[in-house]
UniProtKB/Swiss-Prot annotation:
PANTHER family: 4-HYDROXY-3-METHYLBUT-2-ENYL DIPHOSPHATE REDUCTASE. GO terms for biological process: dimethylallyl diphosphate biosynthetic process; isopentenyl diphosphate biosynthetic process, methylerythritol 4-phosphate pathway; terpenoid biosynthetic process. (2E)-4-hydroxy-3-methylbut-2-enyl diphosphate binds at H49, H85, H135, T176, S234, S235, N236, S279. The lineage of its organism: Bacteria, Pseudomonadati, Pseudomonadota, Alphaproteobacteria, Hyphomicrobiales. This is 4-hydroxy-3-methylbut-2-enyl diphosphate reductase.
Amino acid sequence: MNIAAKPPLTIRLCGPRGFCAGVDRAIQIVVLALKSYGAPVYVRHEIVHNRYVVEGLEAKGAVFVEELDEIPAEHRAQPVVFSAHGVPKSVPEDAASRNLFYLDATCPLVSKVHKQAMRHNRLGRHVVLIGHAGHPEVIGTMGQLPEGSVSLIETIEDADAYAPADPDNLGYVTQTTLSVDDTAGVIARLQQRFPNLTAPAADSICYATTNRQEVVKQAAPGCDLFIIVGAPNSSNSKRLVEVALRAGAKKSILVQRAAELDWDEIGAISTLGLSAGASAPEVIVNEIIEAFRARFDARVELAETVQETENFLVNRELRSIELTAADMAFVNG
């Protein structure tokens, strides 16, 4: 097919998109640990929720486990990395009891939520955590506090049904990757029911989640299709699909790789929105664009709201190790 025969397509490419500072830092920690200590480096849980990233790190020598007892005795001297989502307090305690050397890749913004929750608890408040049951970040945050001192609220319906023992002594925090609008609704309902509910000192939803949702909102109206690059277990990616639909996209889908695209289902479109969750690498965004260019006379327009400059330092033990562009080429291209 020659270019003249290809139907025209405008791709609204969202910015910011893809990796946030916390994800970048977590991946860098694994890469630098491999350079410093050699393979294998063990990682408890997926370092970030993206199979492409996980498989790329496995190819470099990382070994992913769900529990510390999966690490063979002969490799106990090798480092184990905790994922960006954070872990309960019991996990580093377990690592110490096994004489494991661990590197914590918890996102600093997740650690901030841990501190907010602990402050509520220290001041005698029962903690209300707004988040999704079973998500590793929620498990990690709940695991910072004594059992029974945290209540999980997922929806407005949960907020309506919530019956705390002491309704005048509550403090809330949220998962960092939630829908900004949905969370605002849940908080408003809780505040309506419990006027003395104490907010955290700073917003728990992270800058990257907010920024990616905001630009998708702006780009979605008029889009025949909105593609979010991300994994099905990525909370922030799934929220972007919902945001695109609510903001006016006719259809929105979550895609991990270009090979997943169903061209018969996509059909005839003239405007495509494209963004990526905070754990999705730029190489996959480029892969998606090239797949559309092969079938359409595609023109890319940048839809940008803000430029992100945040950068989080890696663990002190790794800061003397040089990180090169080649080290990160598997995700950055």
